Amino acid sequence: MVRKSKKQKNSNKLFLILLPLAVVIATGVLYFSSNKFLSEANCGCGNPDSEQAGRFQENEKIAIFNGNPVRYQMAELTPVKEALKKTVLGQATDERWIEIDLSEQKLYAHNGNKIDYEFLVSSGKWAPTPTGDFRIWIKLKYTKMEGGVKGTGTYYYLPNVPYTQYFYKGYGLHGTYWHNNFGHPMSHGCVNLATPDAEKLFYWTSPAVPEGKRIIRPFQNDPGTRVVIHN
């Protein structure tokens, strides 16, 4: 029988000691990486549903906000002529940009040296609205939003959210049918607007939405409108 040297025995002991530690570290890295990916993918109020993006879902009959059922319009909204007129005649330019003042709970739609619109909003109460300089990366006439935790009073399931414009991951500007408490924080991170205000903004921003379209992304000749959010 071959005897192991003292040096070999010590090496084996060191390996056995370090192996569990390496497994723990690897597991931890995988766990936190997965959580980071999931949190980034699901942050904000929701994410566009690729299969039904922009479409009105007639089969959705129930809406829930903070654990309570709410009523909502169960018919597709028809854009007002004035909103569509702005799409055709008033193509968005680099002079148009959106300012959101979280301390005032107000949105300002700047057009050069003037302000086209000033709206009350509701920003994040149960989760903060991100601050910074962003660009609209997708616009959807309707989308579904779901989040929070069931049984804690934070769960929400909101189908057919109208006039949604995502500006950062799952954070967006959108119409609101589940409350009318604008001017006060009421969201899970998104920027809530009264639906008529959200509609005007939807057709004012870039990329322009042609009549009949329900979803659009920015492209080279028609980039997303700039969105600046500050306290």
Give the predicted meaning of each segment.
Residues 36-93:
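N-terminal, intrinsically disordered, polar/charged segments of Gram-positive cell-envelope systems
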Residues 2-3, 7-51, 147-231:
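Exported/periplasmic cell-wall-interacting domains
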Residues 70-181, 231:
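Gly/Pro-biased beta-strand-loop elements
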